[in-house]
């Protein structure tokens, strides 16, 4: 269990994350938070949901997934698709999502289990899963 003295601070360091939506912080290197004896800093967004940090997938994997999603959904080239893009917000229904997963399987030479496929909601989710499966496969 960690403890902190009054006036101490915690420093969180991170490598660059994959591309994020405009207005979001990317390439975060460190964050310092003041800590007192009676309270511990909270990493919450203004909406009250916990902040989500996902840096597993390489930026090039996220970019490739973005291209595949655009192609499968027949989106214009200038459409904004990034790691935070939800398939549903891009107009994808469940059949479109299955087709996206099939396109990803073909492109990356992987096999996605049905249970894993159902958990994919965003481009980042797909890219993270691909990296995980590629790592298991030994690529």
Curated annotation (Swiss-Prot):
SUPFAM superfamilies documented for this protein: ACP-like
UniProt pathway: Lipid metabolism; fatty acid biosynthesis
Subcellular location: Plastid, Chloroplast
GO molecular-function terms, A-Z: acyl carrier activity; phosphopantetheine binding
Chain positions with O-(pantetheine 4'-phosphoryl)serine modification: 94
Domain of life from the UniProt record: Eukaryota
Keywords (A to Z) from UniProt: Chloroplast, Fatty acid biosynthesis, Fatty acid metabolism, Lipid biosynthesis, Lipid metabolism, Phosphopantetheine, Phosphoprotein, Plastid, Transit peptide
Transit peptide residue numbers: 1-55
Gene Ontology, cellular component aspect: chloroplast
Family matches, as Pfam families: PP-binding (PF00550)
Record PTM: 4'-phosphopantetheine is transferred from CoA to a specific serine of apo-ACP by acpS. This modification is essential for activity because fatty acids are bound in thioester linkage to the sulfhydryl of the prosthetic group.
PROSITE patterns cross-referenced by the UniProt entry: CARRIER (PS50075), PHOSPHOPANTETHEINE (PS00012)
Family assignment from sequence similarity: Belongs to the acyl carrier protein (ACP) family.
The name this protein goes by in its record: Acyl carrier protein 4, chloroplastic
Organism the protein comes from: Cuphea lanceolata (Cigar flower)
Organism phylogeny: Eukaryota, Viridiplantae, Streptophyta, Embryophyta, Tracheophyta
Recorded name of the encoding gene: ACL1
């Amino acid at each position: 269990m960690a403890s902190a003295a009054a006036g101490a601070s915690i420093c969180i360091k991170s490598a660059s994350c994959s591309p994020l939506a405009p207005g979001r912080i990317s390439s975060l290197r460190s964050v310092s938070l003041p800590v007192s004896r009676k309270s511990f800093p909270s990493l919450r967004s203004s909406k009250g949901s916990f902040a989500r940090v996902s840096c597993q997938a390489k930026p090039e994997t996220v970019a490739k997934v973005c291209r595949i999603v655009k192609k499968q959904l027949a989106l214009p080239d200038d459409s904004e698709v990034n790691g935070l893009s939800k398939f549903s917000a891009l107009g994808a229904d469940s059949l479109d999502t299955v087709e996206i997963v099939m396109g990803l399987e073909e492109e990356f030479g992987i096999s996605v289990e049905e249970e894993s496929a159902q958990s994919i909601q965003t481009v980042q989710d797909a890219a993270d899963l691909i990296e995980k499966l590629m790592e298991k496969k030994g690529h």
